[in-house]
């Protein structure tokens, strides 16, 4: 193991020396100029590593399998948390987070599908159903107003615009979920929307009315309530993911 570390260290030093020789040919090892160049190389490498990490993260946001794995991991973590007695406030927060996991999975999946031209064109065609008039105007603008107003909008810019609009949407309403995906998906599907309707209502009461429902009755969240919510969301995501992955595979 030690020899392998030494080999990697030597390779890193060689790459550093090559970079310095190319960018600072007059710098000699042991001089302040060489030390400054070595420090700049180190900063450059750190920046490259961070950029690569960010690029991988952004790519994962447009991958439905990655988003499914992330959602399942979040629910597993919540389930582990609920194996032990928790303060009431933690149980309430865990319940709310179940809906957040559902919301984010649907949003990122919808966003990911927009990378496919046929799906993007469907979004552009039905934009009036999803966004405000001013947002639709900017979305469909034939000029690339974000970068070069005199240039025609490239295809990828339409993708970015549509994805930005979807990223602002919330899928915490069963009617919104039904309207969006019934319009956008070509794959036949029947999702258990009724199962999440009550869960979302309780979530909204916890978030917006401090645990009081529309009938002005208090809502009590228990360990069992959270476990049921986790199971409900997990089941819905599994059913939805099957459809979304089939849709993704069409393109």
Sequence positions of predicted segments:
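Polyanionic, low-complexity intrinsically disordered segments
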Residues: 1-48, 55-59, 191-251
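Extended low-complexity intrinsically disordered regions
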Residues: 22-51, 151-177
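Helix-loop junctions and short alpha-helical segments
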Residues: 58-196
């Amino acid at each position: 193991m030690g020899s392998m570390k030494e080999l990697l260290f030597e390779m890193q030093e060689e790459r550093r020396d090559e970079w310095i020789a190319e960018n600072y040919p007059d710098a000699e090892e042991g001089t302040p100029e060489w030390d400054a160049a070595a420090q700049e190389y180190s900063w450059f490498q750190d920046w490259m590593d961070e950029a690569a990490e960010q690029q991988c993260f952004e790519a994962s946001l447009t991958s439905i399998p990655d988003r499914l794995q992330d959602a399942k991991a979040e629910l597993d973590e919540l389930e582990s948390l609920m194996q032990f007695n928790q303060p009431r406030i933690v149980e309430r927060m865990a319940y709310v987070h179940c809906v957040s996991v559902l919301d984010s999975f649907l949003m990122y999946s919808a966003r990911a599908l927009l990378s496919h031209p046929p799906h993007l064109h469907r979004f552009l065609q039905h934009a009036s159903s999803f966004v405000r008039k001013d947002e639709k105007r900017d979305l469909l603008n034939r000029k690339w107003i974000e970068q070069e107003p005199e240039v025609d909008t490239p295809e990828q810019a339409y993708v970015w615009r549509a994805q930005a609009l979807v990223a602002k949407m919330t899928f915490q309403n069963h009617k919104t979920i039904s309207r969006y995906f019934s319009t956008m998906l070509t794959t036949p599907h029947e999702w258990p929307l009724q199962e999440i309707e009550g869960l979302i209502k309780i979530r909204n009461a916890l978030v917006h009315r401090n645990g009081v429902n529309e009938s002005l009755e208090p809502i009590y969240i228990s360990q069992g309530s959270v476990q049921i919510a986790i199971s409900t969301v997990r089941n819905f995501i599994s059913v939805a993911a099957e459809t979304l992955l089939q849709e993704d595979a069409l393109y």
